[in-house]
Structure formats: C-alpha cells, structure tokens
C-alpha cells in the first residue's frame, strides 16, 4: 500500500505527506531516527522538499528501509496531507512505550505457545511411528511434560492478557498442523498423572 500511495502522490505531483499514528508504535533507541516510529508518526512531511518548513519524508521516516515506514512489521500508512487537517492524536510517550512493551511481551508468549504446539505435533508423530515399546514410553512421558507446559503457557497468556487489558489473539497462537484432536489429546495428557 505504501508504494501505491507514493506512486499516486508522485503522479499528481503532491508534496505534503501525512503519516498515520497509533498507540504502541515502536520507539527504537528513543532517538530522532527512522527506527523510532513514535517520533515520526502523525506528522506532516515534504515529499520533494518544496515545502521548506517540513522535514523531508524519506529521510525522516526511513520509508523504503526495513526499519522505517512500511518496513518490517510496520502498521503505519501515509497519504496526501494539507497541513490543516490531522486526525491523528499525539500519544503520551510513556503510554506509548508501555503499550509497545506489552505488545512485545504478548508476541513472545504467543511465539512460545506456537513452539510448544509444534513440539507436541512432532512428539505425537514420533509416538505413532515408534515400534520399540521403551522408546514409545519415553516419548509419551515427554509428550505429557510438554502438554503440561502448553497448559501452563496458555493459562499464563490468558492471565497476562486479562491483567493488562489486551485482546487474546487466537490466530497468533495457531500452527498449521494443530487440530482439535491435537488439542484434546494435549489437554488429556496435561491432566493425567
């Protein structure tokens, strides 16, 4: 979408750019650089330099780089601006930092849950393929321990979201090969013994 907005502004020879803003924008090292999305969000920029009172768009936002606007995991957008209408609220830096840090902790918990589910799927496949009874018993014990870990991780994730007023994002804890049957077996194993 960033490329389309830039192309349309170039075709229309539009100079003033308005960048969107949201609570929880990454703050990088806290400096005035493209990695600090909080610093450059919700402001007007000059695309070409024709508006001397405004900072340059690409240099300020890092548009076109991984760390900048429309880069890695960036949720910001931009479009033509008019210097009069800016619907984006300015957020308190501490409030923004707290929201970003909480979202990063939430992403970490989601990643660990996905990793544990992947391990459980692999263990279930290994158990089903095991021909040696001793190996099968060892794998089943490991499966039970891992299922208990998953149950603990899910409880921790739900409590973390509730304690911090965050929405549980079930799509972020799904993996491709995790079925209802896998969930049922995992819960049964976690509650056994």
Predicted stretch roles:
Residues 1-69, 82-193:
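Domain-core detector
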Residues 73:
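Extracellular structured ligand-interaction cores
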Residues 76:
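Catalytic core of tubulin tyrosine ligase-like
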């Amino acid at each position: 979408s960033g490329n389309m907005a830039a192309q349309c502004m170039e075709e229309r020879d539009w100079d003033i750019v308005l960048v969107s803003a949201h609570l929880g924008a990454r703050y990088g090292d806290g400096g005035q650089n493209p990695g600090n999305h909080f610093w450059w969000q919700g402001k007007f920029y000059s695309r070409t330099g024709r508006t001397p009172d405004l900072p340059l768009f690409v240099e300020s936002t890092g548009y076109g780089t991984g760390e900048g606007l429309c880069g890695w995991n960036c949720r910001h957008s931009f479009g033509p601006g008019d210097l009069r209408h800016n619907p984006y609220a300015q957020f308190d830096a501490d409030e923004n930092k707290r929201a970003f840090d909480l979202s990063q902790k939430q992403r970490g918990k989601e990643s660990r849950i996905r990793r544990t589910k992947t391990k459980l799927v692999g263990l279930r496949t290994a158990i089903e393929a095991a021909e040696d009874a001793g190996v099968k018993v060892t794998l089943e014990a490991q499966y039970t321990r891992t299922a208990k870990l998953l149950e603990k991780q899910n409880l921790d994730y739900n409590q973390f979201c509730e304690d911090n007023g965050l929405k549980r994002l079930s799509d972020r804890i799904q993996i491709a090969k995790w079925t209802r049957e896998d969930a049922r077996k995992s819960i049964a194993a976690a509650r056994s013994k």
